[in-house]
Amino acid sequence: GKSYLLFNLFYDHLLASGIPEDNIICIALDDVENEAYRDPYRLYSYITERVQDNREQYYVLIDEAQYAIGKEEMKNPDEPIRLYGVLNSLLRKNNVDVYITGSNSKFLSSDVMTEFRGRGDEIHISPLSFSEFYPASGQEKSDAWRDYLYYGGLPHILTESGGEAKSRYLENLNKEIYLRDMCERYGIRDEESMLILMKVIASAIGSLSNPQKISDTFRSSGNKVITMPTISSYLKYLQESFVVE
């Protein structure tokens, strides 16, 4: 996943490129030991204290940056997100490069494009392709292909044994991470309808999504009536969160 790419592969690349270890600042905000740095201003103070020599280049690696975004900041679009101000301040320093990871449903592409005003670039981390999945699976090719089609290419799937465990992992991931994050970010109160919408879309993979037809599907199946504008908004949220394309 993204944490491994940041703290292992990229970290090792920096060392191999001759960057001193003291010039690489790593902070995993999901680690309880770093809980204090979820306050953006304390995070800024810690980093600037580590950047001692203006003549040297420093690399700041922050994992799970969404932990430094408050719930009220997330819910209220008019509330300034302090973390973004901190990151912009770091980016203004000529000798500091910043690399961050974040939950895709909280740390949005639109934020990168608007808040960092040309200072930020995105790197999308996709699930494994089958050419990556197959050799790591240790299965016969036909069995690996069957599992890949059914369960997808999230790396953690390879660590789960048995279909029940894989299905449980995916269900928990969807409900506890994607769905919860989107509801918090966009102030969605009707979590059940969003979950049903996700199931409707999943049942028609590869088909064009028509908000009016989806609304009619809700109505005909005896679910809650959801208007076409609401469906359109929900689809937009799902796209921004990289749940659908």
Segments from the language model and where they lie:
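Hydrophobic positions on the alpha1 helix immediately C-terminal to the Walker A/P-loop
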Residues: L5-L9
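Post-Walker A helix-loop "phosphate-sensing" segment adjacent to the P-loop in P-loop NTPases
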Residues: Y11-N23
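Short glycine-rich substrate-engagement loop in P-loop NTPases that contacts/grips substrate
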Residues: I25-E56, I81
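Structural recognition of the conserved hydrophobic beta-strand(s) that form the central parallel beta-sheet
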Residues: L61-I62, S89, D97-S103, H124
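Conserved Walker B catalytic segment
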Residues: Q66-Y99
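Short regulatory helix/loop adjacent to the ATP-binding pocket of P-loop NTPases
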Residues: S105-D121, A136-G138
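Amphipathic alpha-helical segments of the small helical/lid subdomains adjacent to P-loop NTPase cores
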Residues: E122-E160
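Accessory nucleic acid-recognition modules appended to NTPase machines
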Residues: G163, S167-E245
